Amino acid sequence: MTIKLESLQSNKGSRRKKMRKGRGIAAGQGASCGFGMRGQKSRSGRPTRPGFEGGQMPLYRRVPKLKHFPIVNQKNFTVLNVSRLNALKDGTIVNLDLLVKEGILTKPKNPLKILGNGNLEVKLTVQAAAFTASAKKKIEEVGGSCELYN
């Protein structure tokens, strides 16, 4: 026997007819339609909304509204003000390793970010992960340059 598209049939018992509720006792789901005798779940307009607990104060309203959740994937920096860079010699290339070697920073765990507090009198080439706008302006006013690295 060859299989043809027009001769295909589904297996016996694999497709069940939809149960028609409320169409007489002989239909199997007449009268109360399988919802029981009385109560909220047997009435029309059911079901109740998600989270409804029968009039009891629901869980989502009992639990306090918490604030100050931690920032996900927060970037942390080792910060340094421009005024601290005056301790270095003119024309120095400044990076995280040099700052540790000179004793300006101790045990840095995060990338370097330069902040713009204070004044700068020394011309430097600063390599950092981030600069504030005021820090970048102060470094470039003196004749230095800012280099970003990731």
Curated annotation (Swiss-Prot):
Chain intervals for the UniProt region annotation (Disordered): 1-57
Name of this chain's protein: Large ribosomal subunit protein uL15
Keyword list, A-Z: Ribonucleoprotein, Ribosomal protein, RNA-binding, rRNA-binding
Biased composition (Gly residues): 25-37
Family from the record: Belongs to the universal ribosomal protein uL15 family.
MF terms in GO: rRNA binding; structural constituent of ribosome
Protein task: Binds to the 23S rRNA.
Gene from which the chain derives: rplO
TM regions (residue ranges): none
Organism listed in the record: Prochlorococcus marinus (strain NATL1A)
Gene Ontology cellular component terms for the protein in this record: cytosolic large ribosomal subunit
